[in-house]
Amino acid sequence: MRHLSVPTDRAQDIIEIIRGYDWQSSEYRIHQIEQDKIVIPLTAEVPDTLPENIIGDIVFIDPIPNPQNHGSWKEIFEKEIGQEMVSKLDDRLSRGHEIIGDIMIQPAHRFDDSRPDYVDVLVRAKMKTHPRIRLTLFDYGVKGKFRVRDLEVAAVRLDRIVQGDELQEIPAELLSSETTIKESGLHIHLDPREVYYSGKLENERIETTRKLLDFRDEINRPLAICDLYCGVGPNLVHLFPHHGLTGPILANDLNPACIPYLFRNLPPLKSLSFLEINGILQVTEDIQIANMDALVLASDRNQHGRWDVLFVNLPHDSLEHLPHLIPLLRKDTPSIIRGWSILPTSELSTLSDRLFSILRNRSSHSDISFKVRKQYGATKSMVGFWIRIRPE
């Protein structure tokens, strides 16, 4: 069977390109054949002559099938280690995992001594249940001022599932946590160890796009969109396929690790070389990219009164930041704020009043709606809200 042989130091980049073309066979495994080379199984649709951006050689070798699904992870776990151990798993280990691209993220906690064998059995059982998972990461919570996940490699799938001390012998390139998300046919590149991303908001992004299309039709022109907490750009990625939806765009994030991904994820920037950005930079006629504190950026009078749509996705602090962001919106035409917030469930009944209070002198011209999206822990809720402000 045809495989693409590539150097391990270019493996992740080439894998992403191959997947972008839908040329990787899902029935067989990517595996290592030499210390510095891996092979990627190819579908029958792959042409004999590959595009110039794909580095490697086509080779003919026997494929290694992906394992068949052996049942639920609990069934596999119980078979290997005993039914009683399932009930003994602590809260973080028994909590559901999350899949981001070809990566599984498993909530866990650090052990003072060596990790118990049953933890590796748990990871192995889940990877057997999900044969397309390449890498599993332990999730120890969040860290740092950018609140990115504190992640550690738990296992990698090569010709077999590699765990524990054996991971030290694996080339770093094969342990890369960079991955590609597919949302509604769109591709979003990211590294969950470096940047924040929530796949749970995909439906929110679809809803946002639909409503902004209606808003565009109402005001009869492309929308000027300001996303001050853009991350790697998932909200914006959903907008670009719709011709005439977006006009000027300001995409900002405080985390510098997000900026290179904006150049890979936003279609108008993909043909550009990545630019180091310190502050704010006009990178195309319509797009500004910024790497700075959102409140500092919002205080720039050059940005005031310019934007039709404001995204506010800083759930733990959205309501505290919002009063400082209102001046960014246009006053001569309708404008929209699309935001998300995490707040105590007991405060949901007063959320509309709080938002009206934040709007101050523009509150009489505003319409507010919100929906509870999910529970966040025992006492809090994630809320998505819309504010429509009529012209003054």
In which residue ranges do the predicted regions lie?
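SAM-dependent transferase fold signal centered on methyltransferase-like domains
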Residues: M1-E392
